[in-house]
């Protein structure tokens, strides 16, 4: 028992440089990339071996057909490619030369585009190992592989049956304050089915609302017993409660819908103004989707290739802040890029951003990036213990005979 305690304690002394399950777009022709496990667009892109497929959807902003091929790579818990594996270790079928064949051109849209859809598994490839996966899409008509690299998409696959039991609880009675600005996670992990003999065999990731910028990696448990770990008063598992995500729904080009102030046509584009976001001194319950988005229009028929693209204008009323203000959501892919950064107007005391987006439902929040790279909540957005945050826990395991990490446990608390 003493040896087990020592080994497991050492696990939580390790740190990792770049935890990131983040999609990345390399070519500006690609828009509205979405990765969904089954039909659950409100959660992380997670499925199980033999379970529902992973769906990958995106638009190419031309009406030209492009021969897009894809390559799938297995990654370890730290999202590094599992270089010790052969492709046959984690998949059956073909990899690297298969073409995305589900293609539809847009119909009667101001901006023509072509929609592509891919489901994994499919007739050409089936995954056989749990863990992290990264798919890269290439344009086969490009002169070279680097020029043809269009985007990467990431998802997670769990074991068919969980190899660990996970209990998660969130409380507003924290070790920092009581029913004020924070939420604290309490967890219990039963790993009695696993044989743990080395500190690198187990990795645990805790996410708030699917965000990787404030992910907690390998929090040290404060209680250990035979086959179990408990986190009851762990400072690393205390999160800022924040506030509910904001949201809008752009469904029609003729009249405003939820959260839309005005829609204008300037001769080339629809200009859609989202209602100005004002400071929120009090908590108001709102069942927003924690950064998720769903593509549809008022007709709700063939949404993928009938929805319009428009210029969406965001306005945030707030004093000038010491850091850069960014829009943040699943549809920004967790990235703090120039296109998501808001500009400040000294005359109106407001922040502004304009993005080219497709019709649909969108939820979002504002975050502030400081000069040192740290990410903070905006003071004007409020910080309330009642906020309905979502927490995800990923448990990775590498047996002594394994050459990479498997995803043996997954939990979600809403």
Residue spans of the language-model regions?
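Bacterial Sec-dependent N-terminal signal peptides
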Residues: 1-22
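Contiguous beta-strand segments within globular domains
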Residues: 26-76, 177-191, 299-314
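Short acidic/polar inter-strand loop motif in beta-rich domains
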Residues: 77-79, 125-126, 139-150, 211-212, ...
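Aromatic-rich carbohydrate-binding modules that target alpha-glucans
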Residues: 91-116, 212-224, 311-359, 371-401
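Ligand-binding face of N-terminal immunoglobulin V-set domains in extracellular IgSF glycoproteins
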Residues: 110-140
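Low-complexity, Pro/Ser/Thr- and charge-rich linker/hinge segments at domain boundaries
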Residues: 157-180, 385-408
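Long, internal scaffold/assembly segments composed of regular secondary structure
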Residues: 197-283
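Basic K/R-rich, polyanion-interacting modules in nucleoproteins and related proteins
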Residues: 272-321, 405-414
